[in-house]
């Protein structure tokens, strides 16, 4: 409890979302070049962009990161065109084999929010799993559909077209969201399944987290799935999603932390780090679309010392930068698993 309260007291400002960020202004403490280049997920970019100047000041490591999407990050580290990749989707067996000696290290934990644009509606829209999945299936198309209004009696939802917005690029956020849809809707699971590049039966696509958030901000009636930091940056209203306890919850730190309580006491493989649609044992506060995001690093690297130092810093001191951006600090057993994997990064 003291650790959690201490973390919550750390003050950090929400950063502006850019395309690439580095530590050009940080003064290195070592004479030799200590640069690292990474690429991948847009989901953790608000947090990574806080880490970069901090780790530069602490260790003189100059990190440059391009948020090109999880699929791009996996491809880049597999081809070794970057020093590390980042993905919200855990690597499949085939992807791990193709990477030829990579470790997958959880380094951040947050939630997929459901922002929407309903002009003149000040109440919080509540979304059941059936309603949310039916919107993305194209079965619910109006905001005043009885299936939507029955849990939003005081909202006076308008007769307005619903425009579901999805990621058009290979996206780890899409992986987490479609994994959730597959858990709560048998039709979605059988027809579309889980993936970074799902076939969407309804809606419009946009590239990147900033892209989908931008479409929603400009389109009355639209909604999407995106990391909570992007919803906040775009000042979007965020829906509450019903969990297995029947409660409607928001993607805040309490909800993410509650969802993480269902994890095993000891993590032995990154495939165990699944938090979408947690069982009732997670409690009434659990947010049902919480997810980890990962750094992918080669076990053999000429920059192994700096890479280990950066990733270790990220999963320890770097966690203190998370709460203001609504990234929940890693649970202790996840941190312990990360330490074991980081040790595998060698020259």
Regions found by a protein language model. Give the residues of each.
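Short, low-complexity disordered leader/linker segments with a strong preference
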Residues: 1-34
């Amino acid at each position: 409890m003291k650790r959690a309260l201490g973390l919550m007291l750390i003050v950090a400002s929400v950063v502006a979302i850019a395309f690439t960020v580095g530590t050009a202004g940080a003064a290195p403490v070592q004479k030799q070049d200590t640069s690292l280049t990474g690429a991948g997920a847009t989901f953790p970019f608000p947090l990574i962009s806080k880490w970069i100047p901090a780790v530069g000041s602490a260790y003189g490591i100059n990190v440059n990161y391009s948020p090109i999407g999880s699929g791009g990050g996996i491809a880049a580290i597999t081809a070794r065109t970057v020093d590390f990749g980042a993905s919200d989707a855990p690597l499949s067996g085939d992807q791990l084999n193709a990477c030829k000696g990579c470790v997958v290290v959880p380094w951040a934990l947050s939630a997929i929010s459901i922002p929407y644009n309903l002009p003149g509606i000040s109440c919080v829209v509540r979304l059941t799993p059936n309603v949310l999945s039916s919107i993305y299936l194209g079965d619910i198309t109006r905001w005043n559909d009885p299936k939507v209004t029955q849990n939003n009696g005081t909202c006076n939802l308008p007769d307005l077209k619903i425009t579901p917005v999805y990621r058009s690029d290979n996206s780890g956020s899409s992986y987490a969201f479609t994994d959730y849809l597959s858990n709560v809707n048998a039709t979605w699971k059988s027809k579309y399944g889980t993936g970074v590049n799902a076939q969407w039966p309804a809606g419009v696509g946009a590239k990147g987290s900033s892209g989908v958030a931008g479409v929603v901000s400009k389109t009355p009636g639209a909604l999407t799935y995106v990391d909570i930091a992007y919803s906040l940056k775009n000042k979007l209203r965020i829906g509450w999603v019903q969990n297995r306890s029947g409660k409607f919850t928001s993607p805040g730190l309490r909800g993410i932390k509650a969802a993480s309580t269902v994890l095993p006491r000891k993590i032995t493989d990154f495939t165990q780090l699944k938090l979408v649609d947690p069982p009732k044992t997670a409690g009434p506060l659990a947010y049902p679309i919480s997810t980890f995001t990962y750094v992918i690093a080669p076990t053999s690297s000429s920059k192994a010392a700096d890479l280990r130092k950066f990733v270790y810093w990220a999963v320890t001191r770097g966690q203190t930068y998370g709460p203001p951006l609504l990234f929940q600090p890693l649970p202790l057993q996840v941190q312990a698993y990360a330490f074991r994997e980081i040790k595998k990064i060698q020259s």
